């Protein structure tokens, strides 16, 4: 069963952080790539620490081994310097899909006792 094997690695491009540059009076969109570098199909979900300011499209999906997806990370307009941005980040969560499951994302994959891995990508805002 897929859930007894820990999920393999993913890669993200960029690898360590996402950077948005001023001015912040307009919506910015930044593309990131998530690559399933493991030998198993995975389900992934993206979380943000600031739902008002940050959005991700698509927020979840399924990737076959070696498959990649391009995500659009958007930052809505905000008053730079007047809001706390220190803890802003995007978290990629992923888990192996059950053997024989259709290639359609299911939230319950993350709610059972299977192992879920996480990768944090901090957001940096340049003035």
UniProtKB/Swiss-Prot annotation:
Modified residues (N-acetylalanine): 2
Function: Central component in molecular interactions underlying sperm crawling. Forms an extensive filament system that extends from sperm villipoda, along the leading edge of the pseudopod.
Keyword flag Cytoplasm: yes
Further details from the record: Around 30 MSP isoforms may exist in C.elegans.
Pfam families in the cross-refs: Motile_Sperm (PF00635)
Name this protein carries in UniProt: Major sperm protein 63
Tissue expr: Sperm.
The UniProt record lists the keyword Zinc-finger: no
InterPro entries the UniProt entry points to: Ig-like_fold, MSP_dom, Nematode_MSP, PapD-like_sf
SUPFAM superfamilies linked: PapD-like (SSF49354)
Annotated ranges, domain MSP: 9-126
Intracellular or extracellular location(s): Cell projection, Pseudopodium; Cytoplasm, Cytoskeleton
Keywords: Acetylation, Cell projection, Cytoplasm, Cytoskeleton
Gene Ontology cellular-component annotations: cytoplasm; cytoskeleton; pseudopodium
Record organism: Caenorhabditis elegans
């Amino acid at each position: 069963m897929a859930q007894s094997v820990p999920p393999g690695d993913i890669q993200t491009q960029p690898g360590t952080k996402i950077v948005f540059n001023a001015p912040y009076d307009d919506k910015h969109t930044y593309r990131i790539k998530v690559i399933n570098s493991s030998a198993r199909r995975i389900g992934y979900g993206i979380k943000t620490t600031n739902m008002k300011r940050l959005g991700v499209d698509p927020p979840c999906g399924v990737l076959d081994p070696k498959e990649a997806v391009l995500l659009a990370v958007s930052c809505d307009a905000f008053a730079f310097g007047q809001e706390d941005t220190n803890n802003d980040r995007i978290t990629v969560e992923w888990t192996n899909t059950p053997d024989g499951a259709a290639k359609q994302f299911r939230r319950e994959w993350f709610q059972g006792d299977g192992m879920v891995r996480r990768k944090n990508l901090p957001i940096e805002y340049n003035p």
